[in-house]
Amino acid sequence: MAAYKLVLIRHGESTWNLENRFSCWYDADLSPAGHEEAKRGGQALRDAGYEFDICLTSVQKRVIRTLWTVLDAIDQMWLPVVRTWRLNERHYGGLTALNKAETAAKHGEAQVKIWRRSYDVPPPPMEPDHPFYSNISKDRRYADLTEDQLPSYESPKDTIARALPFWNEEIVPQIKEGKRVLIAAHGNSLQGIAKHVEGLSEEAIMELNLPTGIPIVYELDKNLKPIKPMQFLGDEETVCKAMEAVAAQGKAKK
């Protein structure tokens, strides 16, 4: 029998997801379709009778708005919310704002897959002459970060390394206190949590395509280890299509 339950949800489609661009730390909002995804995710949680005690999320609006939409759907908008940059999306450095398919056509799908799917290979850094450099690095929400904390690029390994301290120091104690926790975040930061919880290999985590807007449920034992694989609150066809869409983002258009 599970000692705890943990629910994760990846933000709905953003405007830059719609345009197939590397979103990174740019603060893209939800697209209309992404808002509908979040509403459906919230309705799935409502239909399943989920209640929560605390929510944790990033400082990026696409996931904050996803969380708002979910909380509205389950009529729990009063819940406390902890926001942290440590749950932000991976920083894609110099690839930020580039169209993924066009980048694949230019550099080859193999190179884009290395940038997107290699565990410890970072993309090119975001240089000061990048059009979104100031937009991100000078944003006041990051004013308290040290130079070492504010990245100019990240590999998935780097993203996981900055998310895990928050998991260990903030999330784990809440779960062990018996609080029902909802984490709304991004693909790469949620991959980091999944890798840690399930003990997945570097290769396995990079092939994990988490769908947007579909709640993910873990049933955990007293040591916070899963007693069964992650479960998706959605019909199988919808989940598979959503995962396939994520996997196809780095491919050149035919």
From Swiss-Prot:
Location of the active site: 11 (tele-phosphohistidine intermediate), 89 (proton donor/acceptor)
Cross-referenced PROSITE patterns: PG_MUTASE
Single GO molecular function: hydrolase activity
UniProt keywords, alphabetically: Acetylation, Glycolysis, Hydrolase, Isomerase, Phosphoprotein
Note: This is the product of a processed gene created by retroposition from mRNA of an expressed gene. This gene seems to be expressed.
Record-annotated site: Transition state stabilizer: 186
Database matches in Pfam families: His_Phos_1
InterPro entries: His_Pase_superF_clade-1 (IPR013078), His_PPase_superfam (IPR029033), PG/BPGM_mutase_AS (IPR001345), Phosphogly_mut1 (IPR005952)
Modified sites of kind N6-succinyllysine: 251
Residues annotated for substrate binding in this entry: 10-17, 23-24, 62, 89-92, 100, 116-117, 187-188
Source superkingdom: Eukaryota
UniProt similarity note: Belongs to the phosphoglycerate mutase family. BPG-dependent PGAM subfamily.
Protein name: Probable phosphoglycerate mutase 4
Reaction it catalyzes: (2R)-2-phosphoglycerate = (2R)-3-phosphoglycerate; (2R)-3-phospho-glyceroyl phosphate = (2R)-2,3-bisphosphoglycerate + H(+)
UniProt EC number: 5.4.2.11, 5.4.2.4
Coiled coil feature spans: none
Keyword Kinase listed: no
Species annotation: Pan troglodytes (Chimpanzee)
Chain positions with Phosphotyrosine modification: 26
